[in-house]
Amino acid sequence: MTRETALETLADSRRRIDELDLRILELLNARARVVEDIGRAKRILKMPIYEPRREDEVYENITRHNGGPLPSGAVKRVFERIIDEMRNVQKLRMLDKRDNG
């Protein structure tokens, strides 16, 4: 690879990363909207926000479907963070008394 080719590859790869980041953001917000629905339902059903068994199911599902190159441990850590933030979204929805179901 020449210097010129390397610079082109770098610029193109960064552009693709920016596009992927926007897609990830779109998916995270779509997931948060679903989590809001779950929060509403859990509030009505008087269920807890934290359900360790359900979270374990999510981790098992994503690691089972992981085709790499990201190691499954790394994928799980990313999802742990996502789920933690989604739990916060769910808490806010469950505390929102304006939505009476």
PLM-predicted stretches and their roles:
Residues 1-101:
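Domain-level signature for soluble enzymes in the chorismate/prephenate branch of the shikimate pathway
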